[in-house]
């Protein structure tokens, strides 16, 4: 304990004698809260400055970087706004009990022992260094002496290390975009002038030095006052499309005092006590929590044939926490956003489609007018099965069986398996290739699509063993599953080691779809007649060939009759 007073002297002295010229140490505004079991310290860096690092000195005067250390009772975290938040237990390795009379902790007079003073004369003290850089880029440390009174359990304090704020819990200042986007004529004052920028920012408001004005930004600004009131300012531009401010109200408030105390074209300001307007209260640990909720109506546009809206539900929950052992100072203020509503489900038609793409990129597809599609044997055919006219990302498509038939009837006895239980049929010497689908502009929901390619084939007459010329149709049976991407909505194909049975078992819970039209499959090789046709120098008419044959027969018969007549005369 006796080492603490010399320590307070040596820390600033070591900074002063480090160089010939003392650097200009930047001053970081900070907020200290003294709780029952610990102290909380928040550092707010200046705009454009890097997040500062915190160091601390132990009883021997050795510096340590502050970090999360449950053994030493320190916790450090960074808020989304860039502030550094320190929480240190009064039993921390770096917190000491300081006992003094009327002198400040910088004098050389030894402190009075704790046994000789009242609790009001003793404090918990923690020395924190805030590391930063000065204008010349040199590394400097700003020392903060955090002092909390060793109060009886029925007291709690909030004290400030910067000029006296207008409230006890410092809020994050809005970013520049939220401030600059408010036109001068729409600015709603947050505090009266004159006011410093630091005090204005602690209110969570915007500051303009040229007019010394403090005003609300295009967001929700909520505060808890010392006398037990909510102060909530809501900008119409907090949502897109903008809010209907004239419909904004407290969800459970019916009295006149629950209406906005000030409303403009761009802002609505609510100010009401905790014991009214349907505010709920409960106690958790040593804190009392007060909570209320704001709601707004949707902007509905109507014309003679119907109504539309582009708004979602707006609900804003605001909460304030106070120490149950104190009736003066708020501990924290929180604004909660309502989670998005659950997806609405209803019965309705579900459209499935089987299409054939013109190339492997699936950039275009054959339409009704393009059928029948003519393909040569062993040409690839790119097939796609998809869910149509749905936007639910939780839906998935399962492809069970796909097969081909020589006619429109999907139940034809003559058929060839393409996919069996969602996997390529291994009995084919040209196996079907499954094609993965990635998210893209034309496929925003990849789980809606299944793609595969097959090689063109021709059905063969079982008895005569010749290829059947005629149309070939494709068919698939599919099912819809939820949620997409889970094991119940995915088929894994094993490594094929033996010939798979080709029987297709159609599930009763699946739907069957077919291609929009047939395919005409042609032989890629030429027969003898085609070769003769190709090698001829001129086209050969079949009727001319018939006449030539008939003439030859007649000439041969005439010659034969003449030969027999001459022989008879002899």
Curated annotation (Swiss-Prot):
Domain ZP, first and last residues per copy: 223-496
PTM annotation: Proteolytically cleaved before the transmembrane segment to yield the secreted ectodomain incorporated in the zona pellucida.
Main location (coarse class): membrane
Residue ranges the record assigns to the propeptide: 497-570
UniProt keyword Disulfide bond present: yes
CC annotations in GO: collagen-containing extracellular matrix; egg coat; extracellular region; plasma membrane
Compartment(s) of residence: Cell membrane
Membrane-crossing residue ranges in chain numbering: 546-566
Disulphide bridges: 402-476
Keywords recorded for this protein, A-Z: Cell membrane, Cleavage on pair of basic residues, Disulfide bond, Extracellular matrix, Fertilization, Glycoprotein, Membrane, Receptor, Secreted, Signal, Transmembrane, Transmembrane helix
Domain notes: The ZP domain is involved in the polymerization of the ZP proteins to form the zona pellucida.
Role, per record: Component of the zona pellucida, an extracellular matrix surrounding oocytes which mediates sperm binding, induction of the acrosome reaction and prevents post-fertilization polyspermy. The zona pellucida is composed of 3 to 4 glycoproteins, ZP1, ZP2, ZP3, and ZP4. ZP4 may act as a sperm receptor.
Family statement drawn from the similarity comment of this UniProt entry: Belongs to the ZP domain family. ZPB subfamily.
Protein's recorded name: Zona pellucida sperm-binding protein 4
Source organism of this protein record: Felis catus (Cat)
């Amino acid at each position: 304990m006796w080492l603490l007073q010399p320590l307070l002297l040596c820390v600033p002295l070591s900074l002063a004698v480090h160089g010939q010229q003392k650097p200009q140490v930047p001053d970081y505004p900070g907020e200290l809260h003294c709780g029952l079991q610990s102290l909380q310290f928040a550092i707010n860096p200046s705009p454009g400055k890097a997040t500062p690092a915190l160091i601390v000195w132990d009883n021997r005067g050795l510096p340590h970087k502050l970090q999360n250390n449950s053994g030493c009772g320190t916790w450090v975290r960074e808020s989304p706004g860039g502030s550094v938040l320190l929480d240190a237990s009064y039993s921390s390795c770096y917190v000491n009990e300081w006992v003094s009379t009327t002198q400040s902790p910088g004098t050389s007079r030894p402190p009075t022992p704790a046994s000789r003073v009242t609790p009001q004369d003793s404090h918990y003290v923690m020395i924190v260094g805030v590391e930063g850089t000065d204008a010349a880029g040199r590394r400097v440390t700003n020392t903060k002496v955090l002092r909390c009174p060793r109060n009886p359990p029925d007291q709690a304090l909030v004290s400030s290390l910067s000029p006296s704020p207008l409230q006890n819990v410092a809020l994050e200042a809005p970013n520049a975009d939220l401030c600059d986007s408010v036109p001068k004529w729409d600015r709603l004052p947050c505090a009266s002038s004159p006011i410093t920028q630091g005090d204005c920012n602690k209110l969570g408001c915007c500051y303009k030095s040229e007019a010394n004005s403090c005003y609300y930004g295009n967001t929700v600004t909520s505060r808890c006052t010392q006398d037990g009131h909510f102060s909530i300012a809501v900008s119409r531009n907090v949502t897109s499309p903008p809010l209907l401010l004239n419909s904004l109200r407290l969800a459970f408030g019916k009295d006149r005092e629950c209406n906005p105390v000030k409303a403009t074209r761009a802002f609505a300001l609510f100010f009401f006590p905790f014991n009214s307007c349907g505010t709920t209260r409960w106690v958790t640990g040593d804190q009392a929590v007060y909570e209320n909720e704001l709601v707004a109506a949707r902007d509905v546009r109507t014309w003679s044939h119907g109504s539309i809206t582009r708004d979602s539900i707006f609900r804003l929950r605001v909460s304030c926490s106070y120490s149950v052992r104190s009736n003066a100072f708020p501990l924290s203020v929180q604004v909660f956003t309502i989670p998005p509503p659950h997806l609405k489900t209803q019965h309705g038609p579900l459209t499935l489609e089987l299409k054939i793409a013109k190339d492997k990129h699936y950039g275009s597809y054959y339409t009704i007018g393009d059928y029948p599609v003519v393909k040569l044997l062993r040409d690839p055919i790119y097939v796609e099965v998809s869910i149509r006219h749905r936007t639910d990302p939780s839906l998935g498509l399962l492809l069970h069986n796909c097969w081909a038939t020589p006619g429109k009837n999907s139940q034809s006895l003559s058929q060839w398996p393409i996919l069996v239980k969602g996997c390529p049929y291994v009995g084919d010497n040209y196996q079907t290739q499954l094609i993965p689908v990635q998210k893209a502009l034309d496929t925003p929901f990849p789980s809606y699509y299944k793609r595969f390619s097959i090689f063109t084939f021709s059905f063969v007459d079982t008895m005569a063993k010749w290829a059947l010329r005629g149309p070939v149709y494709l068919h698939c049976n599919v099912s819809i599953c939820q949620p997409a991407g889970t094991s119940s909505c995915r088929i894994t194909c094993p490594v094929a080691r033996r010939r798979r049975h080709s029987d297709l078992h159609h599930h009763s819970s699946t739907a069957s779809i077919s291609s929009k039209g047939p395919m005409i499959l042609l032989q890629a090789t030429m027969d003898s007649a085609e070769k003769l046709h190709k090698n001829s120098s001129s086209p050969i008419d079949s009727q001319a060939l018939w006449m030539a044959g008939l003439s030859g027969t007649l000439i041969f018969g005439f010659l034969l009759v003449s030969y027999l007549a001459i022989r008879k005369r002899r």
